[in-house]
């Protein structure tokens, strides 16, 4: 994983010089080399600027970052050790950069400092906001002399590297491992810290081995780890959120753009640099990489929408990340060939195929987030549904994604939760509720779970109701759907239908409940005026009870409850289709 991220950073030229980090500058204090006491404030933008950074040393009371630092350090209300360190660094930089010397000189003038504070207050620059300097319109962090000076100056303030050489886990080269790896940013929305989270962290004795301390337990070079950080920072920034996790994905190489129908499809917004005022990159390699990401994103989209993805000759990498206690939690890491991924996605879409709940073709495609909602208990007008997904589904979502992308088995929790969703939705006594059938997307979870976890299901479990299915529980569900339809035909204005009253008990103990429903059916059939429908329902019940067999199951386990739900669902859809076909036939004859 680390090596793949490093390769991504090298390919995109994302790695920064040693000791550099990307920062956002809120405001620039502008000076003039020609006009004394000239002070203006120029507001920054949201772009992250590569700047020198001394890392954890800046967390102490004596040292600070240089060039770009918080207002409380650069322009303090009272002089302190950190502000003195900042100004002294400008003095030393001033030996090779005249603009830095001018800034250091101005910062030693108390009258000008008061003027600067007033300007900062007017522009509402807070003590925690990062600021920097401009001289005659030149930004100090863009100085051509800064990098070479920084390499030498940094060696004087950084503690000497101790320890033996060790092979870097990322590159394999011998290196003196960094004591503390840089933090990864962008996970705040999924439980991380605003200041970043540690990907490699050995701050507790229990995490260490063989007497090694800190990051020496996972030795990485400063340059290689900086590249990994740059790659993750970029990938995380535009990664979608799924159940409280960042869905990060990338590919190992470019693909040919020729005859690429997916080039303009861009799920995460790449390829729009020209629309943001930046010069568009005409380099073939960059365009191919955009094409690869576009095609790759379309693959992920196909998981959600059911569309077919095109061929891509590349290796995919997928990370599910969240932040916990200041650390990066890798929930799942997947990699593999794209052709295999495409086959598994096609299998996923085939397994999902299920009749529409009201016989209007097959169920419509649904985004993966919408499907995952069917694994939560139903709550009407739930405004915190996504918070619930983050809390309740973060544990099984990685396993679900692995099953989708790898073509494997689904966790049993999927079937348990889908059944719970169906029951909870039926129990909502809502006068405005018009759904008589079960939720189609929840039943799709049950169908896929049965197909993948029980091999004998594949032969008999189809998109539509199968009258020859060998499982009695399947036909028990179909029988209940018929009883419910008979009740609806006899008493269309009833407030609580049969499914709402008896479904939860019938799916667990069908032998106890179906007998009672059969007795009620006699009363309901007598209320139906049309002999045609009476005979139709009797014939349906006779066929279904013949399929159940001589003994109705006493209790149903998880597998058979899933069959029960699908039998109910598919029989209801079948009756709806038969009714629509009859109406259409009567219209044609008329």
Predicted regions and their residues:
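Extended alpha-helical scaffolding segments
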Residues: 1-156, 175-590
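Beta-strand elements of modular eukaryotic interaction domains
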Residues: 159
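Short cysteine-rich clusters marking metal-coordination/redox-active sites
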Residues: 165-173
């Amino acid at each position: 994983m680390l090596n793949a991220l490093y390769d991504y950073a090298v390919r995109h030229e994302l790695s920064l010089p040693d000791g550099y980090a990307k920062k956002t500058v809120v405001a620039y204090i502008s000076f003039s080399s020609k006009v004394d006491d000239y002070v203006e404030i120029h507001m920054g933008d949201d772009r992250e600027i590569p700047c020198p950074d001394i890392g954890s040393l800046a967390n102490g009371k004596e040292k600070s970052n240089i060039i770009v630092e918080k207002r409380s350090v650069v322009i303090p209300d009272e002089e302190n050790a950190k502000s003195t360190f900042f100004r002294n660094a400008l003095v030393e930089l001033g030996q090779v950069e005249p603009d830095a010397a001018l800034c250091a000189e101005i910062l030693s003038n108390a009258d000008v400092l008061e003027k600067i504070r007033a300007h900062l207050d007017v522009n509402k620059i807070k003590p925690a906001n990062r600021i920097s300097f401009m001289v005659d319109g030149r930004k100090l962090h863009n100085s051509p002399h800064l990098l070479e000076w920084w390499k030498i100056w940094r060696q004087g303030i950084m503690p000497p590297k101790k320890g033996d050489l060790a092979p870097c886990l990322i590159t394999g080269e011998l290196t003196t491992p960094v004591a503390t790896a840089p933090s990864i940013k962008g996970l705040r929305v999924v439980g991380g810290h605003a200041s970043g989270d540690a990907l490699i962290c050995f701050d507790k004795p229990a995490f260490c081995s063989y007497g090694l301390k800190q990051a020496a337990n996972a030795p990485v070079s400063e340059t290689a780890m900086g590249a990994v950080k740059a790659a993750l920072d970029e990938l995380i920034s535009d990664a979608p959120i799924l159940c409280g996790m960042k869905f990060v994905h990338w590919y190992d190489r470019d693909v040919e753009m020729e005859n690429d129908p997916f080039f303009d499809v861009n799920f995460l917004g790449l390829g729009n640099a020209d629309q943001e005022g930046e010069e568009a990159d005409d380099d073939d390699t960059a365009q191919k990489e955009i094409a690869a990401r576009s095609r790759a994103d379309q693959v992920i989209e196909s998981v959600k929408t059911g569309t077919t993805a095109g061929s891509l000759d590349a290796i995919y990498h997928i990370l599910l990340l969240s932040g916990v206690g200041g650390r990066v939690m890798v929930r799942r890491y997947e990699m593999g060939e794209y052709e295999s991924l495409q086959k598994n996605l096609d299998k996923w879409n085939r397994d999902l195929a299920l009749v529409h709940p009201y016989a209007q073709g097959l169920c419509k495609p649904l985004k993966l987030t919408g499907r995952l909602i069917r694994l939560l208990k139903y709550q009407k007008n739930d405004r915190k549904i996504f918070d619930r997904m983050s809390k309740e589904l973060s544990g099984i979502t990685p396993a679900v994604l692995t099953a989708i992308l790898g073509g494997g088995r689904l966790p049993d929790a999927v079937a348990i939760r889908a059944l719970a969703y169906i029951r909870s939705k039926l129990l909502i006594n809502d006068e405005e509720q018009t759904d008589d059938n079960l939720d189609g997307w929840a039943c799709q979870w049950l169908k896929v779970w049965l197909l993948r976890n029980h091999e004998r299901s594949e032969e008999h479990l189809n998109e539509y109701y199968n009258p020859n299915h060998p499982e009695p529980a399947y036909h028990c569900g179909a029988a209940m759907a018929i009883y419910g339809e008979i009740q609806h035909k006899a008493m269309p204005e009833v407030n609580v239908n049969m499914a709402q009253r008896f479904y939860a008990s019938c799916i667990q103990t069908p032998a106890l409940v179906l007998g009672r429903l059969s007795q009620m059916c006699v009363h309901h059939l007598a209320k139906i005026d049309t002999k045609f429908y009476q005979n139709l329902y009797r014939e349906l019940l006779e066929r279904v009870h013949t399929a159940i067999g001589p003994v109705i199951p006493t209790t149903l386990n998880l597998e058979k409850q899933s069959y029960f739900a699908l039998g109910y669902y598919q029989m209801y859809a079948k009756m709806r289709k038969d009714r629509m076909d009859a109406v259409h036939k009567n219209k044609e004859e008329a």
